Every structure is written in C-alpha cells, then in structure tokens.
Amino acid sequence: LAMICDSTNVFSLGKAGSELDVRKSMLNIMSGLKKRIIIASFASNVARLETAFYCAEKTGRQISLVGRSMHRIFKAARQCGYLKDVIEPVDPRDANKISKDRIIYLCTGSQGEPMGALNRIANEIHPDVNIESGDTVIFSSKIIPGNEKKLYALQNSIVKRDIEVITEENAFVHVSGHANREDLKDMYQWVK
C-alpha cells in the first residue's frame, strides 16, 4: 500500500484556512461594493467558484463566467454533481445589459496570463467585458512564484484606471487548496 500526497505547503506552519471563512469575508467585502465586481481565480478551484456564486446570490447579483477554462471547469463540475444548486450564469455577451451594481464577472487570468480573460479585459481587448472607474477587481488567489512581475504590472494597469484592486495582501480573499504541515501530519496519523 502506498500513499502519495501533495506537499506544496509543507513549509507553511499550522493548519490551512477554511473556504467557509473566505466565503464569509468575500460576502462582507462584496456587500459594500456599488459597481461591477470582477473576481479572478483559478478555474480549477471549484470551491472558490461556489463561493463566488454564493456571494452573487446573497448580494442580489448575476454572475457571468469569462474565459474558456472557467466555462470548461464549470461544466465538468456540474457533470460531476458539484455546483448544482447555484444560480445560472449569464452569458458575457448579455451581462452588459445588466445594471453595473448587479453583476459579477468570474474570470480566468489571476496570474496575469497574457491571454487570460482578466488581462484582455484590463487591456480593453475583450470582446464582451469592459471595466471602468469605480469597479472592483478581486484577485482571489495567491501569486505563484515567478509570476510577480507580470501580475504586478496587470494590477498597476488596473489601478491606473481608478479601479479598486483587492488581493490576499490587503483582504482575506484566498485560502490555499493545499494542506499545511499540521494538516499533513493529521492525514498521516489517520492512515496509520
């Protein structure tokens, strides 16, 4: 018998944070925002997608998925029985018809990828989504080492347009999906 596990956060002491705690924090943040909200996250983080949908519903907003992998993961999650009870997403082409205080865009590009949806939105080359002064972009992810330069450049370009940027550095909007050291110790104890 062999056990193989993820050790990405083995050097992070204590236990990993809870998605439920992030959900509460993000709901609190979003409840106070008056214009468009753009959330950039890893599409593969289905729990974070569920958090975004939960916050959209609780704040009376529609949600629109932007980016191919966001659509692909959403569809796969539904096929596997996840995200069954969330509100139906709005097509990005129709989202511009919704009042600015009633829409959340959940998009790819949280690492500043040149072809990611957020980069295309920020550079005003996305065919369906635009942002403007007073909107808020939430980076609901951690910076992967090596992506700092392009991600800070993206964030700076957004801020220069008078758009608020919220990151894990200035608000509680992300917990890792990887187990911390104490979580790993617990797991090894359970399987002994």
Q: Which sequence ranges carry the predicted segments?
A:
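Acidic/His-rich, metal-assisted hydrolase cores and their charged scaffolds
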Residues: 1-192
